Amino acid sequence: ASMPHIVDEGRRVINNIQRAASLFLVKTTFSTILSILTLFFMSRYPFEPIQLTLISSCTIGIPSFFLALEANHARVEGNFLINVLGRALPGALCVVLSILYVNISSLFFQMTPAAMSAMCVLLTGTSSLIVLYRVCTPFTRKRLLIFSSMTALFVACIVFLPGIFSLVRLSYMQFVLTGAGMAAIPFVMDFFFRFGNRFKLKERLLKVGK
């Protein structure tokens, strides 16, 4: 009689760990890549510690805590590692491309290190929130509340507490460049997700063939 309950609890744990792991792996991946790029190519790391705290809190720490408590008894499908990487890698790659975009833009437009950091925070926050959106879909009331609250919190911190997070006011051109980058991120990430889904499909077809 207790077996269905045990199965449901097992599914809840695995499904919720998959969601939380995807969020954590985004930061781990892009931090590792950026550290290597900074070591060999870039003069400075693009973020201040307090800025990473803002991004991590709004897109990883707080949402993963509440997502882990959610009742989720859906059947576990696919490979755990591939499922996690399929959600995390597109976001991490978008963050890295965003940082490179800012650094390349700085070669053509005058930017202070503080302005570059502010641009990187906005672009990284956008990428991370889109990953959170992907992790939360399909939406339930709780997931919608989590995503909406974290987005509102991130925007509120940017608008009302810029000094605490070492964010400077951007010039008109810097604002335009940042806006263009933010507008492009959903399309770039969608491309990476589609590429990842094709990889998953090929893996399934190979398994069926065997």
Regions found by a protein language model. Give the residues of each.
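Conserved N-terminal alpha-helical segment that immediately precedes and caps sugar-phosphate-binding
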Residues: 44-45, 168, 190
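Mid-to-C-terminal catalytic subdomains of enzymes
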Residues: 147
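Membrane-embedded transport module
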Residues: 1-143, 152-162
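Membrane-helix boundary connector in multi-pass membrane proteins
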Residues: 161-173
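Alpha-helical transmembrane segments
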Residues: 128-132, 158, 184-195
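Transmembrane alpha-helices
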Residues: 93, 150-155, 177-184
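Membrane-interface capping segments at transmembrane-helix boundaries
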Residues: 136-139, 188-208
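Small-residue-rich transmembrane alpha-helices that serve as helix-helix interface/gating elements
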Residues: 121-124, 172-187
